[in-house]
């Protein structure tokens, strides 16, 4: 089976404040699980080595260091670009996919939503198996995938 390993937190920007609410939810949890022996990118397992390098804003190393923690900072999509009420940027999923899989590995997403996990997996050369129960959102996922790749999506029953 799949083992629950950790809950990661996505801190979102661009929150709309509501005066009647004392504490606003500015995060979303992400459950990370594994099946079998986990793969961790060797680049990301050399934590002390990475932390001892020059870490500054505006370079890839800065992002790589932040990707090692269970709190993720990633910008939300502007509302004008969202096709799904809770659409996430594919770059949010790239963090976990890049760190915990290698090209050719499979990724399982049980809440397909807008297909951002599928897009991230495709861009990183992983196979993604996605489940989405809502036919409207299933169609959205297929549309986004086919637009990105120029290929016909494969639906499994």
Across the structure, where does each feature detected by a protein language model lie?
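Core catalytic lobe of class I
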Residues: 1-131, 135-138
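SAM-dependent methyltransferase catalytic region
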Residues: 152-157
């Amino acid at each position: 089976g799949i083992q629950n390993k950790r809950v990661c937190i996505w801190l979102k920007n661009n929150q709309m404040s509501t005066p009647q609410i004392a504490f606003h939810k500015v995060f979303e949890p992400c459950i990370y699980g594994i099946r079998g022996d986990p793969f961790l990118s060797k680049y990301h397992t050399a934590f002390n080595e990475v932390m001892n390098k020059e870490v500054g804003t505006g370079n890839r190393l800065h992002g790589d260091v932040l990707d090692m923690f269970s709190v993720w900072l990633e910008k939300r999509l502007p509302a004008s670009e969202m096709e799904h009420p809770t659409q996430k940027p594919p770059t949010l999923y790239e963090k976990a996919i890049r760190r915990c899989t290698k090209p050719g590995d499979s990724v399982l997403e049980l809440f397909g939503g807008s297909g951002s996990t599928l897009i991230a997996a495709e861009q990183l050369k992983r196979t993604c198996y996605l489940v989405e129960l809502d036919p409207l959102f299933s169609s959205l996922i297929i549309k986004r995938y086919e637009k990105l790749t120029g290929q016909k999506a494969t639906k499994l029953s």
